[in-house]
Amino acid sequence: MQMNYTKWLDSSFLEKKEKEIIFELSEKEKNECFSGYLEFGTGGMRGIMGLGTNRMNKYIIRKATQGLSNYLIKTCGETGKNKGVVISFDCRNNSSDFALETALVLCANGIKTYLLSSLRSTPELSFAVRELKCQAGVMITASHNPKEYNGYKVYWKDGGQLVEPEASGIVSEVNNVDEFLDVKIISKEEAISSGLLNILNDELDEKYLSYVKNESVLNISKKDFKLVYSPLHGTGGRPVKKLLNDLGYSVFVPKAQEFPDGNFPTCSYANPEEKNVFDLSIKLADEVGAEVCIANDPDADRTGMMVKYKGEWIYLNGNQIGILLLDYILKNSKNIPKNSAIASTIVSTPMLDFIAEDNNLKIFRTLTGFKYIGEKIREFEEGKYNNSFLFGMEESIGYLKGTYVRDKDGILGAMLLTEMSCYYKGIGLSLIHI
């Protein structure tokens, strides 16, 4: 700990005010902030924001990005540098700053870089990697963790999270980087004038949403159906409202949770797996006469819901939602290929196996983590198996239909859950009946 602390206190790279903050740390705080380095694992890194080697800050972001740059250049050469990296970020405090730091290190290494100008969801980042044909992508997010946290997730050229061999390769490179001496960085002005930094505004938004819309199962009547949706202060608000309004749904949003806010003032733990995050939604639903509440986590890759039945609000867990979605897709989709397959994690419900067997579908079980479902989709496309991807899910409220992204998509999830709820209401049923 002391070596790391002294290194930072004596470093010429730190600003005067940063050194003052470090100098004032208590012994306990020194240990917490400087005991080792924030771990960059096979899925990236996530931690409490603050100064120190064991905290999320611009210096540790630079270290991670230099390691990513080194790996990309070593393994992909000029081709990888020209294909480049796309960067997005969520609503969290410092996310936009961390995204810019990431971009400036990539550009300093001669890597073409696309930076989203404002916050976007994690699934749209996955889409952007594929649409722009980039070598990699970076998402600045800590998902549903408390407000003190932020994170850094790396995606590879197929739009999926890192798997082997890239995962271990990048981890090794990051671990070999000194956060001060080994990092290359240039100014934003230099990055733009060099032609390496490309700022993206809304160029991808409509195309992404069009792919989501294409995964709709039925064109149904929306008459008399009302929905309450909450982005929980996150990135889902704008795209989900636009998507559902375009499709003709009557959507109500709790005003206190409608707009991005990294302090998450109404829910300290913005996780749609927790019933209490629906409190404001339920209050609004009772006022407007809605019987379904749907919520995304802050980076909008996961989707939770509650349903009103006989006057009570009932929470549906990830396994229940996944089974309902799969059943709805199988019963109402036309022309499902005979070689269709389902992919899910080993910890998700065994009921999927029975549904697959009843419908003559192949099911593939993966290790825990949606990145392995994304890897399975790639293997289908490469011909490793004679199957095509139909649906993927994990019990932690993550779902995917289609192959336009390679990660769970909470915006798609919101659309499908809305559509499914509306369909069953139209035939006189609640999801609780199914």
Language model features by range: what are they?
Residues F34-N54, S143, P231-P239, P298, ...:
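Conserved phosphate/anionic-ligand binding catalytic regions in large, soluble enzymes, centered on
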Residues N4-T102, N109, A191, L197-L227, ...:
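An N-terminal, well-structured beta->alpha segment
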Residues I397, R406-S430:
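Mobile "lid/hinge" segments at catalytic clefts and subdomain interfaces of large enzymes
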Residues E78, V86-Y149, N245, S250-M305:
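N-terminal small/polar loop signature for handling phosphorylated ligands or for N-terminal nucleophile
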Residues S117, V177-L200, Y309-F391, Y399-K401:
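Proline/glycine-rich low-complexity loops and linkers
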Residues E124-D182, P298, Y309, E395:
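Active-site phosphate-binding/coordination module
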Residues I432-I434:
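Conserved small/polar residues in nucleotide/adenosyl-binding loops
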Residues E29-L38, N150-V277, L284-A285:
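Gly/Ser/Thr-enriched, mixed-charge loops and adjacent short helices
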